[in-house]
A protein has these predicted regions:
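Extended, well-ordered alpha-helical scaffold segments
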Residues: 23-37, 94-110, 139-155, 199-217, ...
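Extended ligand-binding groove/face enriched in aromatic
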Residues: 92, 96-186, 190, 194, ...
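Low-complexity, Ser/Thr/Pro/Gly-enriched N-terminal "stalk/linker" regions
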Residues: 21-80, 88, 92, 96-97, ...
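Bacterial Sec-dependent signal peptides at the C-terminal "C-region" and cleavage site
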Residues: 12-23
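Extended ligand-binding clefts on enzyme/binding-domain cores
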Residues: 181-300, 314, 337-351
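Carbohydrate-binding/catalytic loop surfaces
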Residues: 50-73, 124-137, 164-183, 223-252, ...
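Conserved small/polar residues in nucleotide/adenosyl-binding loops
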Residues: 386-395
């Protein structure tokens, strides 16, 4: 049985609003719970006529108890997370029926490899689904879908600016000539993978260029991030940094900073350039310094109503996953500090304060995707994926 020990000091540091976790984080127990919730979701998706494999669980609002599902389309950025959940669950349980379900849901996204890019979310859509599928099965058809989709994502790269255009649909309505959102850092992983697995080597250059320009322009002097960077397409210069899903242009949106932490950890992994390792630590440290005691952030670090403002479990899960990896690249002292922080985060997320339990078929409660738009609030498939990935991370470092 796989257990991670949580020190006494960690336990004592937890705030009273969170159920006190035990002295160990039992990863198998956590994954067993996720497997049970995955089965509940599958049961909920079944109808008298079977399962519609193009309909993906997306979110469960605070006053609801069942998944809201969305059709897998090029516009639906969350559609790759549920297949990814199934692949991770199969990896743990070795349940062949789960593998079959993962294959069927994954196959419903194949069209994305043959469709012009709608926006930057192709990495979320395809690498979470086909990427995990290929990792576990080595199905050559999956590999080709990833390679083709990486080429599609590359069409959004603007060499004058040096980054990928995130939201073509917002160019005219918001007068954002070339916009790049922090979420885009996650999609670089697919480009790196494709470049070293038979794809165009230029994909590597795109990923590095995007990481460099984002590092230069999308962070404040204190290493907190802007959600959106708006660039001039003629000069390539930054026009402004703004928010879209955070509280204000000047604040640190929790999930955006989480994307940055994970993204630059990946960029270091793929390049081994020490400047990215240094930067990953800087964006991590400002995040850790401002966390509440239970290590689960408020949805924005300057949100109104703190300490009663909503938390974002999805950001915590993303950061926990990143720090478990980042800790392996650093000397014992620093690495241990990051690993311990990740364990504290996972201990909180596995407590009764954050688990959905029997109330909902999701893994966790208290996520915030887009508070200003009241979207993806409370339980989301995004956090189900990132939470499961965080627990699986030690298995493939």
């Amino acid at each position: 049985m796989k257990k991670i020990v949580v020190g006494l000091a960690v336990m004592l540091g937890f705030c009273t609003c969170v159920h006190q976790p035990s002295g160990t984080l039992d990863v198998n127990k956590a994954l067993d719970y996720c497997a049970e919730q995955t089965q509940r979701t599958l049961a909920e998706l079944k109808t008298d006529s079977g399962i519609d494999y193009t309909m993906m669980p997306r979110n469960i609002m605070t006053d609801e108890h069942h998944w809201n599902c969305r059709k897998a389309t090029k516009e639906e950025w969350c559609a790759g997370f549920w297949p990814g959940v199934l692949w991770y669950d199969y990896e743990y349980t070795k349940d062949k029926q789960i593998q079959k379900e993962a294959e069927k849901f994954t196959n419903s996204l194949e069209f994305l490899s043959k469709t012009p890019a709608f926006d930057h979310d192709l990495g979320f859509l395809v690498f979470c689904s086909y990427g995990n599928g290929y990792r576990l099965t080595k199905n050559p058809a999956y590999k080709q879908v990833i390679l083709d989709t990486a080429d599609t994502l590359a069409t959004l790269f603007n060499p004058i600016v040096g980054t990928i255009l995130s939201w073509p649909r917002e160019v005219e309505p918001r007068n954002w000539p070339h916009n790049t959102i922090m979420d885009n850092m996650i999609n670089l992983e697919m480009l790196f993978w494709a470049a070293k697995n038979g794809g165009n080597p230029y994909l590597y250059d795109i990923a590095v260029s995007h990481a460099d320009k984002t590092m230069k322009c999308q962070f404040r002097p204190d290493y907190t991030s802007y959600h959106v960077a708006v660039y001039d397409t003629i000069t390539g210069n930054l026009i402004k940094g703004v928010t879209h899903q955070g509280y204000a242009d000047s604040t640190m949106w929790a999930r955006g900073q989480a994307w940055a932490i994970y993204g630059y950890t990946v960029v270091y992994r793929e390049t081994k350039d020490p400047k990215y390792l240094d930067f990953a630590q800087k964006v991590t440290d400002v995040y850790l310094e401002r966390l509440p005691e239970d290590k689960v952030p408020y949805w924005d670090f300057s949100a109104p109503g703190i300490p009663d403002a909503p938390r974002d479990a999805s950001a915590a899960a993303v950061v926990a996953s990143a720090l478990l990896e980042l800790s392996t690249y650093l000397p014992n002292g620093t690495g241990k500090r990051y690993k311990d922080a990740a364990i504290e985060m996972l201990a909180s997320l596995n407590s009764d304060s954050y688990r959905s339990g029997k109330s909902k078929p999701s893994f966790l409660l208290h996520s915030v995707g887009h508070w200003p738009a009241h979207s993806e609030i409370d339980a989301s498939i995004t956090v189900s994926y990132t939470h499961l990935r965080a627990h699986e991370t030690p298995e493939h470092l």
